[in-house]
């Protein structure tokens, strides 16, 4: 299930390392994560109050992330005036570990904007 969250283009060594790190969680951790994200951590009604003039918001989603799809991200961004969205091609749910070089192509421009 978790391996499907990683883009197939990710380097094999990074893919393996990402899966190894995730597998270190005990039984039930992933199920608990999903419950939190969908029930306890459901902030859909609160996102409208985010003031992007006070705190810019950049939403980056990997195209292979089925746990937080591009559609989910776009729907959330539509509720937050000023939110910036980037769908990251050839990346999944763990972009920083599954393909660090590809992730840099997306995160560095965001960091440059923030630094201005």
Positions of predicted regions on the chain:
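Conserved alpha/beta-hydrolase catalytic His-Asp/Glu region
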Residues: 1-51
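Alpha-helical elements of Rossmann-like donor-binding domains used by nucleotide-donor carbohydrate transfer enzymes
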Residues: 17, 32-36, 74-75, 102-109
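Conserved loop-to-helix N-cap of the C-terminal "lid" that shapes the substrate pocket in Rossmann-like
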Residues: 27, 70, 97-100
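Short, well-ordered coil/turn elements that cap or connect secondary structure elements
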Residues: 52-54, 80
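Short beta-strand/loop motif that positions the catalytic acidic residue
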Residues: 53, 59-61
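Acidic catalytic loop of the alpha/beta-hydrolase fold
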Residues: 63-68
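Short alpha-helix in the alpha/beta-hydrolase fold that links the catalytic acid
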Residues: 69-78
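Catalytic active-site module of serine/aspartate enzymes centered on a nucleophile-bearing elbow/loop
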Residues: 81-116
């Amino acid at each position: 299930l978790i391996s499907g969250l990683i883009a197939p283009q990710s380097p094999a060594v990074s893919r393996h390392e990402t899966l190894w790190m995730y597998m270190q969680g005990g039984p039930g951790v992933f199920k608990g994560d999903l419950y939190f994200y969908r029930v306890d951590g459901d902030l859909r009604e609160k996102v409208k109050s985010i003031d992007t003039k006070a705190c810019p918001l950049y939403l980056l989603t990997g195209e292979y992330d089925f746990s937080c799809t591009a559609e989910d991200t776009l729907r959330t961004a539509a509720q937050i005036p000023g939110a910036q969205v980037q769908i990251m091609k050839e990346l999944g749910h763990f972009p920083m570990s599954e393909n660090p070089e590809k992730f840099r192509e997306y995160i560095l421009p965001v960091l440059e904007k923030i630094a201005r």
